[in-house]
Amino acid sequence: ITKNAETTIYTYTIENVSGNPKESFSPGPSFLYPHLLFVAKSFSVKTEKKPLFSSPADLYKWYKSLVDSMKDDKTVFAAKVKELTANAKNDEEKIKNIYYWVQDNIRYIAFEDGIAGFKPDDSQNVFQKKYGDCKGMANLTKQMLKEAGFDARLCWIGTNHIAYDYSTPSLSVDNHMICALFKNGKKYFLDGTEKYNSFGEYAQRIQGKEVLIEDGDKFILDKIPVQNATTNTEKSNISYIIDNETLKGKVKIEFLGESRASFLYSY
């Protein structure tokens, strides 16, 4: 620790440390390895103290400032929303048509350059380019649902790669954005980056994780539902016969949930 008239400098040194091994299906490094996490709560300019991230409210306030600076133009995709919902039998079908259209037609490409790593792209840009990152895809899903008359909101969430929750007010807490839909007293979470997740299904990487939901000047903290293991099963039904010393048979394999998504991504 070194000090001068204006600053205090903390220097951490680590030497002769082996590289961290990578193992399939292991938790993220923040679960496994000793590390330092710097939480910038405030700073002072002369006698004035300026807050940064001392609470989840501070974190949300900054995220909201980014969202408020966006210039969404729903007129660009209003006709597409009308087309997707015109022949729907009910509200659930309208929601599914919009959600699945985003999954099928918007290609996921990550953007992490400067403020673009935190600020969603305007929805009309994602719609016209037909690609975006999780933030842009979440925003397009939200705006298309709003155009259709639904209460849809942006969400910030950390995947199961990250050990922290929002009790730690830091930009290190989350690495993903999704969309929340409020309908008949229930919340549904829509992740356009999960190409093969059906409406009401949640990827294993976000199940049980704390989620920060926009709510005007306030925010809502909730958790993504954890689904029963049986929703992700792979079932095999195999019958064999021996016909003149030749083995013959029929195989039926049924994939559900995450196993279905993995199969579809592979083939």
Segment roles from a protein language model:
Residues 1-111, 242-245, 249-266:
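Secretory-pathway-linked proteins and extracytosolic
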Residues 20-21, 105-109, 119-120, 159-165, ...:
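Flexible loop/turn segments at secondary-structure boundaries
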Residues 74-79, 107-130, 160, 171:
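Short, conserved helix/loop micro-motifs enriched in His/Cys and acidic residues
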Residues 92-108, 121-132, 136-151:
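Active-site-proximal cofactor/substrate-binding loop regions of enzyme domains
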Residues 1-6, 158-163, 224-226, 266-267:
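Solvent-exposed beta-strand/loop surfaces of large extracellular or lumenal domains
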